């Protein structure tokens, strides 16, 4: 469950290392975001000499949360961190590599490019 002011790790090589959520896209009164939701975030920590810089406002899709994800078959998945992938306006990732495991539910939300770049899909 991601809400405004939540800090997230970045799971790609776009140049950002840490994000802070400032808004959840989709509804004006929505309080929490879950896996597959798009957020507006500000970069809190960035890699030097990369295209993305600190204090830049970006869009990102959430790929891992500490809160459990319940599947229809009864399986529960929980990750060790909150992580997101920086995307552009069309929903394509800005980085060329994805780090860590991501859930297969992202394929249902039409983030097939992120799923294809990921080393492990749970």
From Swiss-Prot:
Q: Which InterPro entries match?
A: Ribosomal_uL14, Ribosomal_uL14_bac-type, Ribosomal_uL14_CS, Ribosomal_uL14_sf
Q: Where in the cell is it found?
A: Plastid
Q: Name one GO molecular function term.
A: structural constituent of ribosome
Q: Which cysteines are joined by disulfide bonds?
A: none
Q: Can you name a GO cellular component term? A: cytosolic large ribosomal subunit
Please verify whether the record's keywords include Ribosomal protein.
yes
Chief site of localization:
plastid
Keyword terms, alphabetized: Plastid, Ribonucleoprotein, Ribosomal protein, RNA-binding, rRNA-binding
- One matching Pfam family, short form? Ribosomal_L14
Judging by the UniProt lineage, the source's domain of life is Eukaryota
Alphabetical list of SUPFAM superfamilies matching this protein: Ribosomal protein L14 (SSF50193)
Q: Name one GO biological process term.
A: translation
UniProt lists the family membership as follows:
Belongs to the universal ribosomal protein uL14 family.
Assembly = Part of the 50S ribosomal subunit.
Say what the protein does.
Binds to 23S rRNA.
Q: What's the protein here called?
A: Large ribosomal subunit protein uL14c
Gene symbol?
A: rpl14
